[in-house]
Amino acid sequence: MKNCSEKLWKPFRDEVVISTKFGISFSEYTNGDIIPDARPEKIRQSVEGSLKRLQTETIDLYFQHRIDPKVEPEVVAEVMGELIKEGKIRHWGVSVAPEDYIRRAHKVTPISAVQDRYSMMARGIEKLFPTLEELGIGFVAYSPLANGLLSGAYEKATNKNFEAVVDYRSRMPQFTPEAMKKNEELMAFLQKTAEEHSATMSQLSLAWMLGKHSWLTAIPSSRKLERIVENAGGAVVKLSAEEIKAIDEALDKLPKSDIFGVKNN
């Protein structure tokens, strides 16, 4: 977005939330592996770079992308507090962090949001929800559609349909022929339930998630405008607590394949 960010944001800067991340680099020697780096000097270097690239005076929500085992949470939280006082960020959060890390960091500078993988096929993070509710921390779900699988758009697709190297879905376990076969019953259930609510599968998946808690949101991604519009419609579909519970009970029983980042069996 270099050289065009100001034109994009300026007319409606007060109407959008700008969120970005810090805390990782990519190895030049091991196929681009993620290297956590949350040293205070690196954090400051990262925030200055983001402010410059985004051409904004402050970042609304600044996430630690991955936990750095070499830097204590209190150290990271202290730097976040300094950046808030300096007006460079408004809020901060952590991504893929254990409960102990969250609690320790939160004591130093309150965390506004935790981000992690969450979908109908990746529900392990639900065990952290009571802690987030206790501390008053919001939750941001990434991959809420299991990298597109729960949209139903790839019902007949397998890894071979995605361009190797360029499209990471070509390497994801949920798109193997065996996985697609295993998920047929789940997909049929979601399709039927979506139709009962005059919704698409994507909208049902997102409505189920958003109906769980008022402090939970999701960040589905898409390269197509029609998909973005469709996903936004998930906020309009309303499910009762009883309906959400019934879906949960069905999900507990239905067979599910592994997905990227999660072992289901």
Label each residue range with its predicted role.
Residues 1-20, 159, 256, 264:
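N-terminal binding-site loop/beta-alpha segment at the start of enzyme catalytic domains
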Residues 5, 40-43, 47, 73-76, ...:
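Aromatic/hydrophobic pocket-lining residues that form the small-molecule binding cavity
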Residues 6-17, 51-55, 84, 105-109:
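Acidic (Asp/Glu)-rich catalytic clusters
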Residues 25-32, 150, 227:
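A short acidic, helix-capping loop that chelates divalent metal ions and anchors anionic groups
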Residues 29-44, 65:
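Active-site mouth loops of central-metabolism enzymes
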Residues 38-53, 98-103:
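Short, acidic/polar
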Residues 51-70:
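Active-site groove signature of glycoside hydrolases
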Residues 67-254, 259:
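Beta/alpha (TIM)-barrel catalytic core signal, keyed to glycine-rich beta->alpha loops juxtaposed to Asp/Glu
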